[in-house]
Amino acid sequence: VIEARSEVGGTASSETFSGVTVNICNCDHLTFRTTGVSEDLDLAKHGLKYLDVDPTQLATSWSDRRIWPHFRDVDKTLDVIKHFFKDEVDGYRAYLRDAMPIAEMIIDAASQPPTRRSLISKVISRRGRGVTTMLRWSKLSSAQVLRKYFKSELLIGPALVTGPTVWGVSPHTPGTGLGALTYAMRHVSKVGRPIGGSGMVPISLRR
């Protein structure tokens, strides 16, 4: 593991700010749990253990009093959408049809060192499912992608907040389209929070 900063752990590491210790990016962990890094470094032996988080997200807005949960289970999430956004159910299903193959392919590819041979073999094994959509989305902005499926800002906003906005770029920036995978990724992988907080990642790395 190579770190450019003096503190290990990337955005999970802690800094002193206004007299308190905070994570640079206080977030639940999803992608990190799919890469195999924790297992390769045996971080559980050094204190990194997770609690699975479900619902994976609670969303609301400044102007709307509705608070709606997003679950890992697709059917439970569709039930929520039926309750809060009746005219968005078909759009969410269409989104998942396009997004899930991409998310599954990315997670699969991240599970081992990416070589040209391994990536090609994964695409072939999936019969190319998701490749065309992935290439098309990658040229668009995240906002453009999500607006192809959803009308309500209450559905679009939470996906953008945990996507490109976290990266520090506008969701209207061309080339951020794969940031629209937020919801799909939460169905494909387990969202978790380290026991002891996000800072347990750098602590376990130091140990």
What are these regions (language model features)?
Residues 1-107:
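N-terminal glycine-rich phosphate/pyrophosphate-binding loop and immediately adjacent elements
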Residues 17-20, 166-168, 189-192:
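A short glycine/serine-rich beta->alpha loop
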Residues 42, 169-173, 186-191:
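Short helix-capping/linker segments at secondary-structure and domain boundaries
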Residues 137, 180-207:
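Helical element adjacent to the flavin cofactor pocket in flavoenzyme catalytic cores
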Residues 32, 141, 200:
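Short, conserved clusters of charged catalytic residues that mark active-site
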Residues 63-174:
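Rossmann-like flavin
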